[in-house]
């Protein structure tokens, strides 16, 4: 049986290797000059290839449960065993994130490339697919390098995110030609643009924070974790996780940052009173020294209206104003940084048109899809790559 796989990213390579290991003849088409370019950019170049906590709760889409079968059929243990058999050594951090022992994304890609070579998979790079045509029970795949006949096709062309490293709309358009539909698309795992007044002065400062995104009094989404101030707004793992809701949320949003998320109001008030005594004789802007980054502490006090006053001159009412800024430092959201900067696409091909136990189309027999092209996206921390491995493996089994 001849299988044509469109897209040589993580999911496509997994599907190709699985299909080949099952004894099928595999043709892998990739529009870039080499396979796996986006893989090299994951985990800040370290390749966070999975997460020990991978479960449906960490995934999103119009049908969140669609991912459950694939994640259990080829779970984290099976994934790591599969990579281990191909020579990759990994290390697991306390957070559950799994990286190659080398801390180099290239190690993961090299293992996959060598596996493709060992399986003698017919790989065509620099190949753009323009159309998939039905041909009896099979297909003709039309490309700029000619046409290819296939008994089955696996669509693994990825999403719109990360256009600089291979993100494209091709997969959606090819599926549409065959009668499939997609949901709305949004950038996810992406930085927020905010009013730059405060972030610009805090560029490079990291902090642990509780995060609440609001539209007026309405809470749109919440999170917690490490944030990073940038010249254009805020970034960091915790921001990435709430960015999906921000992308889809439209205009009029604000983000509130709680820099003391483990404390209640009484604890905060008592601590500020203690800090006032400790900082006696110093400027109010130093009140938070020892707890927050010095620049962040000064900015919080400035936002409350205090900078050069002596700390011991602050009244209890003044401390309440500082506490408010500490617990709800508010920035208007101007938007997100877009698909170019996004790590993943939220949205994709409608999953109610695919069988979750095979990844086969319900509309077009012998057509399969896997990875980011489908309407499934995961949280930050290796979840999206686990979806690529799990769905790619399931699609590569070519079950009916």
Predicted segment positions?
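Beta1/beta-strand and adjacent pyrophosphate-binding region of the FAD-binding site
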Residues: 1-11
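An anion/pyrophosphate-binding glycine-rich loop and adjacent beta-alpha core
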Residues: 33-35, 40-41, 49-56, 89, ...
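Glycine-rich active-site loop/strand segments that organize a redox cofactor
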Residues: 44-92
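A glycine-rich dinucleotide-binding beta-alpha-beta segment and adjacent secondary-structure elements
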Residues: 125, 298-377
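Glycine-rich loop(s) and the adjacent beta-strand/alpha-helix scaffold that form part
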Residues: 152-198
